Amino acid sequence: SALFLAMHYTPDTLTAFSSVTHICRDVNYGWLIRYIHANGASLFFICLYLHIGRGIYYGSYSYMETWNIGIILLFLTMA
């Protein structure tokens, strides 16, 4: 869904809001693509936090190299 949104979105500060309005009103099922993208991104981060919680619960933080690589990947995902 991100690819379809990127085809119509403009990141310029003056036209960003109007491009989102264009996606929701003028693109066929643009409103649906936008909501699927937003909910999919939220679900992705919920799964990411659950995965971290599972690692904390099972004591995976004791494997320092693996844990640090995971933290770096988390920060890169959020950047």
Swiss-Prot record:
Cofactor list: heme b
Q: Could you name the domain of life of the organism this protein comes from?
A: Eukaryota
- Please provide, in alphabetical order, the Gene Ontology terms of the cellular component aspect for this entry: mitochondrial inner membrane
PROSITE patterns registered for this protein in UniProt: CYTB_NTER
Choose any GO biological process term that the UniProt entry carries and state it.
mitochondrial electron transport, ubiquinol to cytochrome c
The protein's location, in the record's own words, is:
Mitochondrion inner membrane
Classify the protein's membrane topology as the record does.
Answer: Multi-pass membrane protein
Which of UniProt's keywords are assigned here? Electron transport, Heme, Iron, Membrane, Metal-binding, Mitochondrion, Mitochondrion inner membrane, Respiratory chain, Transmembrane, Transmembrane helix, Transport, Ubiquinone
Family matches, as SUPFAM superfamilies: Transmembrane di-heme cytochromes
Q: How is the cofactor bound?
A: Binds 2 heme b groups non-covalently.
GO MF terms listed in the record are: metal ion binding; ubiquinol-cytochrome-c reductase activity
Show the Pfam families listed in the entry: Cytochrome_B (PF00033)
| Binding sites annotated in the UniProt record for heme b b562 | 37
So where does this one cross the membrane?
1-7, 31-52, 67-79
Q: Which family does it belong to?
A: Belongs to the cytochrome b family.
Question: What quaternary structure, including any partners, is listed in this protein's UniProt entry?
Answer: The cytochrome bc1 complex contains 11 subunits: 3 respiratory subunits (MT-CYB, CYC1 and UQCRFS1), 2 core proteins (UQCRC1 and UQCRC2) and 6 low-molecular weight proteins (UQCRH/QCR6, UQCRB/QCR7, UQCRQ/QCR8, UQCR10/QCR9, UQCR11/QCR10 and a cleavage product of UQCRFS1). This cytochrome bc1 complex then forms a dimer.
What does this gene product do? Component of the ubiquinol-cytochrome c reductase complex (complex III or cytochrome b-c1 complex) that is part of the mitochondrial respiratory chain. The b-c1 complex mediates electron transfer from ubiquinol to cytochrome c. Contributes to the generation of a proton gradient across the mitochondrial membrane that is then used for ATP synthesis.
Q: What is this protein called?
A: Cytochrome b
The species this protein was found in:
Dipodomys panamintinus (Panamint kangaroo rat)
The taxonomic lineage of its organism, from the top, reads:
Eukaryota, Metazoa, Chordata, Craniata, Vertebrata
